[in-house]
Amino acid sequence: MEPLRQSTDDLDRTGKQTQEGYAPFIIVVNSGWVDGERAMHLVERKNKTGFSVMDSDDINRFKPIEGITIPDGMAYMLADIDTGKQTLNVTPNEALPTILQQNRSPLTLEEGIALITHYPELLGKNNGFSLLASRCGDRRVTALWISGGRPKLGWCWAGNPHTWLGSASCGGRRGLPAGNSL
C-alpha cells in the first residue's frame, strides 16, 4: 500500500478536513478481491455491524456505469469524497448530471462500502447516500443508510427523491503508479 500512501502527498486538503460529509481519501479494494455482502458485515458504526438486504449474487450484478473507469489492481485510492448533502431530496437521475457537470464522479457500490469502512461516522441517521456509479440494467440504484441503528446496503428507485438520501461523489480515482503492484 506504500505507493498509494505516497500518492496522497499532493492532495489539496485545505479547509475540507473538518467539513461535514467529506473525506480527503480512502483506499478501495477492487470487487474481484472482496465480496460486497461480506464487506458490509465488517462495517461497524457505534458498536453495530452493517448488513445488506441484497445477497452476493444481486450485489455482483451491479457494475460501473459507462464513463467510470476503475483502476486496475487489487486496490486504488479514491480522493476528495463528498457524501452528497447538496443532493438530498434530489432523484438519482437528476443528481448524476449535476455531479458530472461539477467534474466529479459518482461512487460505485464498492467505493461506498469502503467509505463507511474508513469513516463510519459519515453515514448518519436520516442522511444516507446513493452510489450512482453502479447499476445493473434496471431502475435500481444502490444506497447506504442507517436502519435500526445499523449501516445498511440496499437500493432505491433511480427516479424517487428522498429527503434523507443524497448522492455521493469523488474528485478522482488513482491507481498504483506504473511498475507497482499489490
Predicted regions and their residues:
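A binding-site-centric feature that preferentially detects glycan-recognition modules on secreted/surface proteins
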Residues: M1-S105, L109-L182
